[in-house]
Regions:
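Surface-exposed short loop/turn segments
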Residues: 19-20, 69, 80, 84-129
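A structural "domain/chain start" motif
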Residues: 15-69, 77-86, 165-166
């Protein structure tokens, strides 16, 4: 029974959020003390995502996450300029269910869903170069859970800030 539970937990983990972070290894992240949020983009045909309320929520989550890391938000000159982009794409999940002997009657089921992507860029305004980027992707099957998913995507993205250079 323990093995079955472990297998189920591993299967669930495969369907979770995907967070990818890349950064400039030559950047000195200790010098960044302030940030400013610049106009982001909402690139979605999904009306649940293409909303000013969603944009404000993302910006509030970002501000909360960076403030917890010791950075201060400013509206003037800043050490980092932040821009976020939210988009969504239609995807189709295909599953095959064998229904009979010798492969006869295999049933194919296609389930459409939306996949949301949040890209957060941090740029150094003095050099105008990208110093840190997080790309968070997750399935959006239930619109009522959107707010919690966005909160989680932002938090998990900034769990990897500042990056640890190896």
């Amino acid at each position: 029974m323990y093995r079955l539970g472990l297998l189920f937990a591993c299967a669930l983990a495969a369907y979770g959020q995907k967070i990818n972070v890349e950064f400039d290894r030559g950047a000195d992240f200790a010098k960044f003390k302030t940030f400013a949020i610049r106009a982001g983009n909402l690139n979605s045909r999904n009306p649940a995502l293409n909303s000013e309320l969603v944009k404000k929520q993302i910006e509030a989550d970002i501000e909360r996450s960076l403030s917890a890391k010791g950075l201060e938000m400013t509206t003037g000159r800043s050490d980092l300029n932040l821009r976020d982009t939210l988009g969504s794409a239609r995807r189709v999940e295909t599953e095959a269910y064998p229904a009979g002997w010798y492969g006869w009657g295999t049933r194919i089921v296609r389930v459409p869903y939306a996949e949301g992507t949040l890209v957060i860029d941090l740029r150094d305004p003095t050099t105008r170069s990208l110093v840190w980027r997080a790309i968070a992707t997750e399935e959006q099957r239930d619109p009522s859970k959107l707010q919690g998913k966005l909160d989680s995507m932002v938090k998990k993205s900034f769990d990897k800030y500042p990056p640890k250079v190896k």
